[in-house]
């Protein structure tokens, strides 16, 4: 079998990296691999010696032996990959092996973009329990730290870390109401962030196109990120807009970083909708200008012209105020459906209108909770509309 580019992964602590021609014995030697060390430097062809869980040496090990040897000729050797936007929060509960990521070389899952697995109050636990689909589990934790302890104690192959979700903090105190927190509520929200940081959270994560996250004003986010910054926490964000108001959304993130002093990272940076593609150059300039001023601003992105989200992102925020049950109740009203249709067909709406950015021909349906609808998986929204005789 011809192997063009197979990756061999390691996540070990580097304690030596020099050539050694003396005779030594190791637990493991990986020979002749093309080493990508994660620094961005050009790869080097070399050997790697491992003792226990540590890299003992990188270099010429032709005179050394090991209990086990791997010939990595023609293969690449790299540190374990980091999934910076992991939604394995629930799958890891029922199967800690994480095989879908482990087999791709991922060794660290970072969660908490907007929503996190804690802190939870009793009503949040009931709501989460009622909304479980194929993955069923008991919620045996309350705080984010307790969730992380739970999956580690249960057994998990990957390393895990999490931001505390700004949405989770908001729902904990305000539910799904579209309003600003009172001063007392905001103080409790800040304290929840501090508690999460003491439990090991990386910082605060937001996902501002989704309800109820988009009910939060900038000042609310500044307050939460400031609390995280007391513990050297970071801020990550799915921006408030990735389309018509992309530049304004980037400036909001820069403002939050500037006021709080927290490093900030834009998650899956993009310009959604062809009419907005030209904005990326200006966004790059905004980021570089902020960095030149001393702010620690970064971004990550994926290299394809698509996105994945829920159909809730195609409907205006007002329709979802109050949570899932209130949203469904509104959809049962013909008056509301007519109003929704009118707003969804407005390409210049104030909210992040993914329906118009992609169009019904560009929206691919990939999952349903209702078994009767699973037959539509893999079809576009336009195809399903034609099959059902609806619009």
Predicted regions and their residues:
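Sec-dependent signal peptide recognition
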Residues: 2-9
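C-terminal motif of bacterial Sec signal peptides marking the signal peptidase cleavage site
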Residues: 15-17
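Histidine-rich, glycine-flanked metal-binding segment
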Residues: 22-28, 35, 39-80
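Divalent metal-coordination and catalytic microenvironments
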Residues: 33, 53, 74, 85, ...
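Metal-associated gating/positioning segment near the N- to mid-region
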Residues: 72-142
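Short, acidic/polar
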Residues: 90-98, 185-195, 249
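Active-site neighborhoods of metal-dependent hydrolases
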Residues: 148-151, 156-183, 189-210, 221, ...
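Alpha-helix-loop-beta-strand connector modules within alpha/beta enzyme cores
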Residues: 218, 222-237
């Amino acid at each position: 079998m011809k192997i063009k580019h197979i990756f061999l992964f390691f996540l070990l602590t580097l304690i030596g990296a020099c050539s050694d021609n003396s005779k030594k014995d190791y637990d493991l030697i990986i020979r002749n691999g093309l080493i990508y060390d994660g620094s961005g430097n050009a790869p080097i062809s070399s050997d790697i010696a491992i003792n226990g869980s540590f890299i003992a040496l990188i270099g010429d090990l032709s005179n050394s032996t090991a209990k086990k040897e791997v010939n990595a000729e023609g293969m690449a050797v790299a540190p374990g990959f980091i999934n910076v936007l992991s939604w394995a929060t629930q799958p890891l509960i029922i199967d800690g092996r994480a095989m879908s990521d482990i087999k791709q070389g991922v060794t660290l899952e970072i969660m908490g973009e907007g929503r996190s697995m804690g802190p939870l109050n009793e009503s949040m636990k009931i709501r989460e329990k009622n909304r479980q689909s194929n993955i069923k589990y008991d919620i045996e934790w309350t705080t984010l730290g307790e969730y992380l302890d739970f999956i580690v104690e249960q057994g998990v192959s990957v390393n895990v870390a999490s931001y505390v979700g700004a949405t989770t903090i908001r729902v904990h105190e305000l539910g799904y109401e579209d309003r600003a927190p009172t001063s007392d509520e905001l103080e409790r929200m800040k304290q929840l962030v501090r508690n999460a940081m003491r439990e090991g959270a990386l910082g605060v994560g937001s996902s501002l196109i989704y309800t109820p996250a988009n009910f939060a004003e900038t000042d609310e986010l500044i307050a939460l990120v400031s609390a995280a910054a007391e513990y050297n926490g970071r801020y990550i964000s799915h921006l408030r807009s990735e389309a018509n108001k992309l530049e304004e959304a980037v400036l909001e993130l820069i403002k939050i970083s500037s006021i709080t002093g927290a490093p900030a990272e834009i998650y899956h940076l993009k310009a959604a909708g062809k009419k907005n593609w030209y904005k990326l150059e200006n966004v790059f300039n905004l980021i570089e200008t902020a960095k030149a001023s001393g702010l620690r601003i970064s971004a990550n992105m994926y290299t394809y012209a698509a996105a994945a989200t829920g159909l809730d992102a195609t409907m205006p925020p007002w329709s979802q105020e109050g949570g899932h049950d209130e949203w469904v109740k509104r959809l049962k009203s013909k008056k509301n459906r007519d109003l929704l249709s009118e707003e969804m067909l407005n390409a210049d709406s104030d909210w992040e209108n993914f329906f118009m950015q992609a169009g019904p021909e560009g929206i691919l349906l990939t999952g349903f909770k209702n078994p009767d609808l699973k037959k539509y998986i893999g079809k576009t929204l336009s195809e399903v509309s034609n099959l059902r005789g609806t619009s």
